[in-house]
Amino acid sequence: KIDVTNFSKLGKSIEKNKPDVLIHLAGQTSHSKSFDNPIHDIDVNAKSTLFMLQKIKELNLKCKFVLGSTFIVIGKPEKLPVNEQSFCNPTTIYGANRLLSEHYCKIFNQVYGLDTLIFRITNSFGPREQVIKNKNAVNYLIHQAFKGNKINIYNNGNFYRDLIYISDVITGIKTIIKKGKKGNLYWISSGKKTWFHQLGSWLTQFSDVKIRYVNSPIYTQKVDVGNFVVDNSKLKSLGW
């Protein structure tokens, strides 16, 4: 294990292993924590990507660099469904730094010819995900429900997201690595709307959970992306 902000160890590992494929999934993924410690967030979510790309260039490695990114880079979408051409206007420091990482990949591809690929994931859920309240709302709600704890859902659940199961995310990543065109961006998503009042209804059917519908906090209102669904036809065109 290596801390991706420890550039000395990270560089030595890349130099020693000379990877054919480097999949960058490491990072700080809580938008609230990105406001608490913004300098750390730029180190782990942006500078780490730049360092890896520069190291691959310096060593002249024939390495496919694959960056995992997030739907948060979009901010509040201007138009739905979102696709690879949608305008990005992130509302959080985390989102801004992830978008910066994407731009580093594009620049190193266009200027130096590095084989870079980017994928963005919508709200994923499934086993072995970290259960952190301010990190992955869907997994947190599911976990709390099956523990029998009360859960809060904002705004009567009258908003929807594009939820995707982790096994589908994995097959999407594999497809992009095998068939993706270098320098390109792909969305990994279900392409379907899931309303949160519907999610709440499912949880009450399969558990003893009690749901409270509450107003969202002021902070959430400022940064939340709102309704979100993706057109994933570009990934499907690869045979996914």
Predicted features along the sequence, with ranges:
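C-terminal substrate-binding subdomain of Rossmann-fold SDR/epimerase-dehydratase oxidoreductases
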Residues: 146-240
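Conserved sequence/active-site signature of Rossmann-fold short-chain dehydrogenase/reductase
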Residues: 5, 29, 73, 124-126, ...
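Active-site helix of classical SDR
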Residues: 93, 97-100
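NAD(P)H-binding glycine-rich loop region in Rossmannoid oxidoreductase-like domains
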Residues: 4-44
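Conserved Rossmann-fold NAD(P)-dependent oxidoreductase catalytic core, especially the SDR/UDP-sugar
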Residues: 24, 50-93
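Active-site beta-alpha turn of Rossmann-fold NAD(P)-dependent dehydrogenases/reductases
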Residues: 26, 66-70, 91, 120-122, ...
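NAD(P)-dependent short-chain dehydrogenase/reductase
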Residues: 80, 103-162, 166-175, 202-206
